[in-house]
Amino acid sequence: MIRLEHVSKTFATKNGDVHAVRDVTLQIAEGEIFGIIGFSGAGKSTLVRCINLLERPQSGKVIVDGKDLLALDAAQLRETRKKIGMIFQHFNLMRSRTVAQNVAFPLHKSGLSKAQIKEKVSSLLALVGLSDKADVYP
C-alpha cells in the first residue's frame, strides 16, 4: 500500500520557485496498478521520485507498506527501496537480452535463486500481459 499525505516538492530556480508537486494526497491499495499521466513538466516524475525518496518532499508524509519513509534512516530506506519498483520515463532495454532477461537483470542482485528469479519474471510478465513476449528481443 502507498499513501501520500499532503506531499509537496518545490525547486528553487533563477526565475523563482517551481512547485513541481503541490499538496498531493492519494492512496494506492495493495495489488492496484496506477499510472500517472499529465503534460510535460506537470510533475509526474517528481511525484514518483518522492514516493521512493529519490526526491525528498519539503512537506507531507510518504507511507509505503505502513512505513513512514521520511522517518527511516539511510540503511532502512535502502532495504525498503528494494521492495519498491519504478519504471523510468526514459528507460533503456538491453537489445542483446530478451524481454525476460531484461526483467530478470535487476533481480540477480536481489539474492533470489535462479528458480525464484524465473518464477518472479514469469509472474511479472503475466501481470502486464507479456508472457508471450518473454523470448522476444526488444
Task: Give short role names for the model-derived ranges.
Residues 37-39:
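The feature captures the beta-strand-to-loop junction immediately N-terminal to the Walker
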Residues 17, 73, 100, 126, ...:
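Signature (C-motif/LSGGQ) region and adjacent switch/coupling loops
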Residues 67-68, 104, 108, 114-133:
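Conserved ABC ATPase "signature" region
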Residues 96-105:
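Short coil-to-helix segment of the ABC ATPase nucleotide-binding domain corresponding to the Q-loop/switch region
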Residues 15-18, 69-85, 114:
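ABC ATPase NBD coupling module
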Residues 52:
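Helix-to-loop junction immediately C-terminal to a conserved catalytic motif
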Residues 60-68, 80, 120:
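Conserved ABC transporter NBD signature motif
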